[in-house]
């Protein structure tokens, strides 16, 4: 299974309950991946990749994630940490790396803004920084 490194930088909007200046170091163990090869054979625009897994902090499971990418178009992701989540969306070109905008969240991340950078590597790592 392909693995990704993800760095989340979150700007806390007014009313966001999570403390600004907080940094969370998370890792993901991918539990599923599905690939739909649309159009031209092999990876090409319009193909759909869906994957997700369990999210850990200091070796303890704290949540899960789900990511759906359309090659050459958009990538939509949601990372749940406890009862709260972060939502990110953005353009993803062919290849393992992209940057997306954090467009909101739920619970203590409600109103969150920032960016998420994704780079393909052997393991998935999340770094969440709350600033504001």
Predicted regions and their residues:
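Sec-dependent N-terminal signal peptides
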Residues: 4-13
């Amino acid at each position: 299974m392909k693995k990704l490194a993800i760095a989340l930088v979150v700007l806390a909007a007014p009313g966001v309950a999570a403390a600004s200046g907080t940094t969370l170091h998370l890792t993901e163990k991918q539990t599923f991946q599905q690939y739909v090869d649309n159009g031209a054979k092999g990876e090409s625009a319009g193909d759909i990749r869906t994957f997700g897994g369990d999210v850990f902090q200091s070796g303890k499971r704290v949540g899960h994630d789900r990511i759906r990418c359309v090659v050459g178009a958009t990538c939509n992701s949601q990372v749940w940490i406890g009862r709260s989540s972060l939502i990110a969306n953005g353009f993803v070109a062919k290849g393992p790396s992209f940057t997306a905008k954090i467009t909101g969240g739920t619970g203590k991340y409600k109103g969150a803004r920032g960016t998420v950078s994704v780079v393909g590597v052997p393991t998935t790592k999340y770094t969440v920084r709350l600033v504001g």
